[in-house]
Structure formats: C-alpha cells, structure tokens
C-alpha cells in the first residue's frame, strides 16, 4: 500500500515537472482557453477545424485505462498541496501543443486542464480530432475548489479529442471523462449555447399592443350609446346659426299673438248679453244691462 502511494506520488511529481517546463517549439495548432466566472470557452484557428477522427476502439481502450488509474488515485490522493480552484476569477491562457501528429492530445506538456461534463457528448455536435502528442503515461491531476472538486485527466497519445466547430471559428473541446472522477461544474458547451441566447431574445417578435377598442369592444359600444343624444344636440347647435334661431323665435311669438287675437275677436262678436230688445221693449230693464244699449 505504501509502495503504491510512493509510485503514485512520483508519477504525479513527474507530471508537474513536465507541465511546468516551457514548451520548446510552437506549432500551428494553438488552443486559446478563455475562462470566465460561470463558464469557459475554447477557440481554435480556422485552418485546424476539420481533422479525421481516430478509431473508436482506441478510445474504448484508453477509457478503460483511465478508469483504473482514476480509481487508484482517487482513493490515495484526495487532497494534494497543489490545488487549483475551480471557481477562480476569470483567466486567459494560450496553450500550444508540442507535435503536429493528429493521433492524440497531451495535457501534461501543454498544461491544459479540461474536464467537460457528460452532457457535452449528448448534444450531437460535429466531432473533429485536434492534433497533439505526448509520451507521458496517463496521469490524473486533482484540483479541489471551495465547494466542489474536478479532475483533469491526461490523455494517452492515441486518445481522440472531439471539438464542436462553429461558423465563427470557435470550437468546444470535449474530453473523455473517467467513471470514478467527479465532474467539473463549468461546461464549454453550455457557454456555447448561452452565447446564442441573447440573439434569440433580440430576434423574438415583440407582441403588438392592443388598443382599448380591440380589447373591450362592448365597453366602447355602451359609451357611444350613452353619448348619442349629446352628439345629436351638438350637431343641431352647429347646424343652426344665430339668424335661424332669431327667426324661429319671432315665428313662435307671431303664432301666439294670432291665436289670442282671433279668440278675442270671436268673443266680442258673439256677446253673452244677447241681442237688443225690440222697439217697444227697447227702453225696458233688459236693455240696461246690455253694454250696446244707448239710452241717450
């Protein structure tokens, strides 16, 4: 048990030395790792976005090797003095691989720590192989954050690395996750999908505001019915001028005077006192009460 722990510590120290050593040459494959607080983005140049994928059999073999190594190192090295916080502030790193061979990718020589979640493989993005090499044996580097721990496995030379290529030359790098290792909280594919979210909100059609007439037609009809007499009176007042109003007033007064004058004339014509008496009765008492009587 102690021997296994010592061997594991030696392998871990050798990996740290190789990782800390500067790369001797710069190759055309340049991966720029840009980390933000909630998510991470990996971009690659346009000329290396399409490469042939490696066979599935080698990936299966390497995955089994990584499972065994991860299981042994998880039980022996839960906490190591060299830790990297997963939730560290945003940082930017440029990583250059050491070989142009398209057979695999080495994270020990270039210093890449990739730990994508399994949901990256279920998104159905096109996969391409990024060329990188390494002669180091598979080594697991544990990085424990304040709340969760993530494992960045170093892949063997024959392990494929899949990348999701987009139109703006940004790709999401996916790596094989061992079974016994915890998953990293940040997912490059989630950042890729969230980068398109504002555009969907921007292009979303704005709902048309409805006018009060469209929303409440019944209310508008009731208001028009209640205000109909007022509108008619306003129209009549606007149609009649001051001269027309004066003419109507004079006509009404003339008709009233004519009616009362005709009634008075007819009253006088048909007196209630009756006719005057005959000559032999003219001086009688019956003619004194008659105003038409003249006794002079």
From Swiss-Prot:
Belongs to the PARM family. Expressed in prostate. Detected in other organs at low levels, these include the heart and various tissues of the urogenital tract. Not detected in mammary gland. May regulate TLP1 expression and telomerase activity, thus enabling certain prostatic cells to resist apoptosis. This is Prostate androgen-regulated mucin-like protein 1 homolog. Residues 1-20 form the signal peptide. It is a single-pass type I membrane protein. The modification Phosphoserine is found at residue 284. PANTHER family: PROSTATE ANDROGEN-REGULATED MUCIN-LIKE PROTEIN 1. It comes from Rattus norvegicus (Rat). It is found in: Cell membrane; Golgi apparatus membrane; Endosome membrane. Its main location: membrane. One of its GO terms (cellular component) is early endosome. Residues 80-96, 206-217 have a biased composition (Basic and acidic residues). Residues 97-111, 146-175, 195-205 have a biased composition (Low complexity). Residues 125-145 have a biased composition (Polar residues). Induction: Induced in prostate, after castration. This induction is reversed by androgen supplementation. Highly N-glycosylated and O-glycosylated. Keywords: Cell membrane, Endosome, Glycoprotein, Golgi apparatus, Membrane, Phosphoprotein, Signal, Transmembrane, Transmembrane helix. Glycans are attached at residues 62, 96, 108, 168. Residues 73-220 are annotated as: Disordered. The gene is Parm1.
């Amino acid at each position: 048990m102690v021997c296994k722990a010592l061997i594991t510590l030696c392998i871990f120290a050798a990996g740290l030395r190789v990782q800390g050593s500067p790369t001797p040459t710069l190759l055309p494959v340049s991966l720029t790792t840009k980390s933000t607080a909630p998510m991470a983005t990996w971009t690659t140049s346009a000329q290396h976005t399409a490469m042939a994928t490696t066979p599935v059999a080698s990936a299966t073999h390497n995955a089994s090797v990584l499972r065994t190594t991860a299981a042994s190192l998880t039980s022996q090295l839960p906490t190591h003095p060299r830790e990297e916080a997963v939730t560290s502030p945003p940082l930017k790193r440029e990583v250059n691989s050491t070989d142009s061979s398209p057979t695999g990718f080495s994270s020990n020589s270039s210093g890449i720590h990739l730990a994508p979640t399994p949901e990256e493989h279920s998104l159905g993005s096109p996969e391409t192989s990024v060329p990188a090499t390494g002669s180091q044996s598979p080594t697991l580097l544990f990085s424990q954050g304040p709340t969760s721990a993530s494992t960045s496995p170093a892949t063997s030379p024959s392990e494929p690395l899949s990348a999701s290529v987009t139109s703006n030359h940004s790709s999401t790098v996916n790596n094989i996750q061992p079974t016994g290792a915890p998953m990293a909280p940040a997912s490059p594919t989630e950042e890729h999908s969230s980068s398109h979210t504002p555009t969907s909100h921007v292009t979303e059609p704005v709902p048309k505001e409805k006018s009060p007439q469209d929303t409440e037609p019944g209310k508008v009809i009731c208001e028009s019915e209640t205000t109909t007499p007022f509108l008619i009176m306003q129209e009549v007042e606007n149609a009649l001028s001051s001269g027309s109003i004066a003419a109507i007033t004079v006509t009404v007064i003339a008709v009233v005077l004519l009616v009362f004058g005709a009634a008075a004339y007819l009253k006088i014509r048909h007196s209630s006192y009756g006719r005057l008496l005959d000559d032999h009765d003219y001086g009688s008492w019956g003619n004194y009460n008659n105003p038409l009587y003249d006794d002079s």
